[in-house]
UniProtKB/Swiss-Prot annotation:
This is E3 ubiquitin-protein ligase SopA. One of its GO terms (molecular function) is ubiquitin-protein transferase activity. Residues 137-171 are annotated as: Disordered. Residues 157-171 have a biased composition (Low complexity). It catalyses: S-ubiquitinyl-[E2 ubiquitin-conjugating enzyme]-L-cysteine + [acceptor protein]-L-lysine = [E2 ubiquitin-conjugating enzyme]-L-cysteine + N(6)-ubiquitinyl-[acceptor protein]-L-lysine. One of its GO terms (biological process) is protein ubiquitination. It comes from Salmonella heidelberg (strain SL476). Its main location: secreted.
Amino acid sequence: MKISSGAINFSTIPNQVKKLITSIREHTKNGLTSKITSVKNTHTSLNEKFKTGKDSPIEFALPQKIKDFFQPKDKNTLNKTLITVKNIKDTNNAGKKNISAEDVSKMNAAFMRKHIANQTCDYNYRMTGAAPLPGGVSVSANNRPTVSEGRTPPVSPSLSLQATSSPSSPADWAKKLTDAVLRQKAGETLTAADRDFSNADFRNITFSKILPPSFMERDGDIIKGFNFSNSKFTYSDISHLHFDECRFTYSTLSDVVCSNTKFSNSDMNEVFLQYSITTQQQPSFIDTTLKNTLIRHKANLSGVILNEPDNSSPPSVSRGGNFIRLGDIWLQMPLLWTENAADGFLNHEHNNGKSILMTIDSLPDKYSQEKVRAMEDLVKSLRDGRLTEAGIRPVESSLVSVLAHPPYTQSALISEWLGPVQERFFAHQCQTYNDVPLPAPDTYYQQRLLPVLLDSFDRNSAAMTTHSGLFNQVILHCMTGVDCTDGIRQKAAALYEQYLAHPAVSPHIHNGLFGNYDGSPDWTTRAADNFLLLSSQDSDTAMMLSTDTLLTMLNPTPDTAWDNFYLLRAGENVSTAQISPVELFRHDFPVFLAAFNQQATQRRFGELIDIILSTEEHGELNQQFIAATNQKHSTVKLIDDASVSRLATIFAPLLPEGKLSPAHYQHILSAYHLTDATPQKQAETLFCLSTAFARYSSSAIFGTEHDSPPALRGYAEALMQKAWELSPAIFPSSEQFTDWSDRFHGLHGAFTCTSVVADSMQRHARKYFPSVLSSILPLAWA
């Protein structure tokens, strides 16, 4: 191989090759007669000075790993291949100088790699891990820069250096990324060039369509170590992807959908990040820098690495906007504080937990100074924006949920501005939730709003008694909330001690019933009667109940007992037997009224009363029967002769020969939508209706200890008989059925107290078909 000094265009050759040629020319003085046809992966030490040596051929043995790379049919050929460098002669006979054996060996290696590359275009990628970089330079497996080889055999004696063209469209960029990511997923080690996607264009690309589903799964595959600097992701969708150790510097992520996207250990400095409103879940940043990056007001920054800001100007946004600093990050603010802007930027309760308040607060506590500084800038903006009280009202809860907590309470500026906001928030809570249950407190409410309400009651102690419905609910949820801290519970317990010492409350707790029976609460058990609600109308009336009872009455189920409390007047326990729960709740304790009525509407016993006692024919009697269902005991008795005769006249047509008439039976099935139901389902309903009429005939309602209306006893027994015919399996036994039947009629010496029968049947129904019983039996009787 002869090298000529006149056939090389130096303007197109990388510096390494230029240095190599220059060195050869300097040492050969008068030039070489051979030409370089190809140079590949030449070690950088070739730039050292060439030394003179022998002009005899130099042989180079192939490394074993290169031999093993080829198929067996190639090994025999390659084992015989020797690269000979010969006829490198100095045309200056006066000063023959040859290249040293060391440098010739290096050239041998370069030419050998060229020979191998001509047999497999994948050699460079599979063996050395090298990939082209700009200018034809690559990084080899030992991380040293080399000259990129040609992928095809040389076609001319001139030096050939191949350049790699960039993709021309977002689709091409997406294809290139898919290829690189899949190679990485397969376990291949990518070079820096393989992972270089700087200046890429991914606009409008939905990544879930170009990557396998495993990249979108929780704890799935990761896009790791890629360089996306100065790239465009506008209108793309990178949702559910995890980028680790990636670089996004100066990239544009405008209107990008990044729901639940994770950025970890990444460089996102100087990024324009405005994700789309269709982003459902916030992206997360873990050990990621965001210097001078524009962040929307709905981001979670819990894992961001924050630094001191520089003197950079705010970013330029086409739609305009104001900005505040959060460390070295820029947060976008509205141009004007309108009601819509306040709702969009501040109301995280209305925006799935997202707001600028939550964004700032999401930073860890080690950045408390930066958080306070940013919140002060936000408050100044709100103060200068001159929003009206009506404009602030919808976001008061969101504001106090953040600003009424440390570290922001340390700021005099924030506290001064927030004071009136918190007062209005508290007044609204008292007005709204004194007479209705609070929403079931979630983690957010327990940790952010309950402490604010405790603080407000502490500042305004009179509200404890004037709004005891709300106050007791707040204490209840503080003591039972699984997400409440010990500090919250301790403050709640201390505040309740103040409440119990109030003159309107203290007379009711020294009766041997309250708490631990000595006038103080017992918070070690939920069964203790620790809670005392004052009547909203009569200061002399109070209700005492346990934690469990209060919880279930505020959030009832069909099985909730509505009489498991003490009713106190002047501190003394009074009977509720003849008090209608609905009237008691409406007049004195309205906090339970809505829940009670909601449960009452699900009880359908009244439909049978309307069938038997139509309001047109029996209006007064209908009202008496309905009114009796609203209390445990009735003062109205129907055992006088006139009443007995009237009832007999009404029920006789329904009970020919003591059994339900077919027509009346069909009316019942129709009223309770049982026409197509199974016999067992029909039997369960009739059994529960029988239980209710047994209660009607007992001393608790229309009967006495010694007498009861025969028509009601007979009707109750007829309902039970029909249930037995339909499905004997729903009864405890045939003996129990016979016993109940005898008691209804006083046969065979059976004890005829229908209160006992009603209680026994009710217990059985509650055990074996409780949902049917709960849909029929009046609440006051339950």
